[in-house]
Amino acid sequence: MALPDFTMHQLLEAGVHFGHQTHRWNPKMIRYIYGQRNNIHIIDLAQTVPLLHQALKLVSDTVARGGRILFVGTKRQASDIIADAANRSAQYYVNARWLGGMLTNWKTISNSIHRLRKLDKILATETQGFTKKERLNLERDREKLNRALGGIKDMGSVPDLIFIIDTNKENIAIQEAKRLGIPVIAIIDTNCNPDNVDHPIPGNDDASRAISLYCDLFARAALDGIARQQGAMGIDLGAQADAPVKPILENTIPVSE
C-alpha cells in the first residue's frame, strides 16, 4: 500500500473550498481564505492540500507505530460516514453524543464499556431466564450504551490521535484532548478557530461529499499504517478516478488582511 493520494480536482468536486456566508466567519481564519463569491467565503485549497497531506502521513505513521486513531463526528451528515471510515480501517469512533469525560474520565467510561460487554454476553447466551419485559429492558440498555460507546468498545485506552469533523460542535472533545496532550487533526471551516487544534485542515465541514472524501482518505491512511506495521504491502484498496470539474474560482473576490 501507499499513502492515499488526492487531487485539487477531487477537493473542488467535493466542495471542500466552500466556506460559510461571509458574516458567519471567524477572523482567525483569514489566512486560509482565498476570497469571497456571492457572499460565501472561498477556502484557499492551495493551503488545504499540503496540510491534508501532512495529516494523512501523521495518521499512517501513528498507526504504523501501533497507535490508535479516534474518528469524531456527531453531526447528522457526518455520523454514518465517520462510523464507516473507522470500521473499515480498524480504528475507533464517536458518532453520537460526546459524553463529558470520555477521555479525561476514562476509568468511568471503561466501567460503562464493561457493562456493555456484559449485556452483549447476557443477551447472546442467557436469554432463557428472563421475562419478555426484562429482556426488552436489557436490550434497551444495551442499545443506549452501544450508541454512545460502541465505537470505542474495543479501544482499550485513550487514543493516540484524534480526527475531528466540526471543531465548534466537538469543542468538549478538543478540550479533553488538550488536557491529556492528545494531538488533534481537524477540518476547520471558515467559522472555526484554527488555533484550537494541533493540525488544522481548512475545508468545508458541512457538505456530505466533502466529509466522505476526508473520511475515505483518513481511513486509507490508517490502512496504509496497518500495512506498514505488518509488512503486508500488497493490499489493493482500489484507486479513485478523478472526476473532471469546471473552473469554480473564477470571479472570486480576494480577501485582504
UniProtKB/Swiss-Prot annotation:
The keyword Ribonucleoprotein applies. GO terms for cellular component: cytosolic small ribosomal subunit. It comes from Bartonella quintana (strain Toulouse) (Rochalimaea quintana). The keyword Ribosomal protein applies. HAMAP family: Ribosomal_uS2_B. GO terms for biological process: translation. Gene3D superfamilies: Glucose-6-phosphate isomerase like protein, domain 1, Helix hairpin bin. One of its GO terms (molecular function) is structural constituent of ribosome. Pfam families: Ribosomal_S2. Keywords: Ribonucleoprotein, Ribosomal protein. This is Small ribosomal subunit protein uS2. The gene is rpsB. It comes from the Bacteria. Belongs to the universal ribosomal protein uS2 family.
